[in-house]
């Protein structure tokens, strides 16, 4: 089983979210989507991210732009980096993923595309309403649902859980309960781990 801890506000997570789905399908693996708030992780265990954003190393920042563009091209995705609003408050979008449960994938896909592909501010209710309409979700039920305390509590619990298990960002991916991987570029290693597990179970 794969657990995919994610926040739609991360470009590398957009890539991994897109790229892991055909891998899971190909190998017949089960995947559990675990929405989180990456800002909550940074505040707890990785606050240096904020300093790096304030004072980026120019050469590294320039290469990161190229690296992201290369990966996006490879995945067939459009990514605008940085978006007009960056970082973005993704809390309502991620609560939406929690509220939708097992039906979250079309919504999460549209949130990723709206933010990273279309440069829309996913913190805004009007943008989220537009996404709901696109994927066939009742807007009123959506906004009522993301206001439920149980939904808020689950998002917080997921975020605390990934930190407790050693995570420090998004995407954090587990194969089994303890084999942790971080980032889009670890997917070849995840493939190998899944194949090893398949072989040992045979």
Annotate each PLM feature.
Residues 2-3, 7-29, 34, 102, ...:
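C-terminal cap of thioredoxin/glutaredoxin-like
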Residues 16-118:
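Structural alpha/beta surface segment adjacent to cysteine/selenocysteine redox centers
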């Amino acid at each position: 089983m794969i657990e995919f801890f994610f926040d739609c506000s991360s470009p590398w997570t957009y890539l991994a979210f897109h790229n892991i789905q055909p891998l899971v399908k190909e190998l017949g693996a089960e995947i559990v989507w675990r929405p989180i708030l990456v800002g909550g992780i940074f505040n707890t265990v990785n606050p240096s991210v904020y300093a790096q954003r304030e004072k980026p190393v120019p050469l590294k920042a320039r290469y990161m732009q190229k690296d992201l563009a290369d990966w996006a091209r490879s995945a067939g995705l459009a990514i605008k980096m940085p978006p007009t609003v960056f970082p973005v408050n993704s809390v309502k979008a991620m609560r939406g993923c929690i509220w939708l449960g097992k039906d979250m994938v079309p919504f999460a896909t549209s949130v990723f595309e709206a933010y990273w592909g279309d440069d829309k501010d996913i913190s805004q209710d009007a943008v989220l309403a537009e996404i709901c309409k696109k994927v066939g979700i009742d807007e009123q039920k959506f906004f009522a649902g993301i206001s439920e305390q149980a939904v808020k509590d689950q998002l917080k619990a997921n975020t605390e859980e990934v930190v407790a298990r050693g995570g420090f960002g998004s995407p954090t991916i587990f194969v089994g309960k303890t084999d942790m991987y971080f980032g889009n570029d670890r997917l070849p290693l995840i493939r190998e781990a899944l194949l090893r597990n398949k072989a040992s179970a045979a």
